[in-house]
């Protein structure tokens, strides 16, 4: 009787984080290191964004292009669509521009024949006048926009003295991000994404983000999508 030597092949997981913070980058490495059967592949840290700069999307595309024989692609969709979590709130790009970029990545992902596990954030609305992670006008109108969002969600109407062009910009940004997330749900429904997580960040009892969550819940229920999940927390 001959003893057969079984060689274990490590599962290769390519991970595109939401940005380069330790909780998104080093912590992922620490978690993967717990299981000796996992090989975690990450883009160079300098390609990823932070509080002050966007991710280098073209560089991340080239990195994915260079990958060979990966089993799983774990992807922050905010990174490939906007350049990160903060740019997803600040970006002035159109829905068409974002969709075209995402579709280019999707074609690349499909060519890797790997399971795709994707995460996208539902745009938050913070109750403060701090624009460090928001558009410039948040420093003056942040709390008022929060109240406008709260009242509109709670009562179906709202009054505000925030300039109409700022309200319009905010609503259009939310609508664009909502539509992109709807596209992601379609990718999950068609099987392109094996799993899609839509993450809720800094939620209050009422708000336009809460309305969007309810719409997503209704879509998921109507389409009976077991592979689309709504979870709390964007960084996690």
Predicted regions and their residues:
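An N-terminal assembly and electron-transfer interface module characteristic of large anaerobic redox
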Residues: 2-236
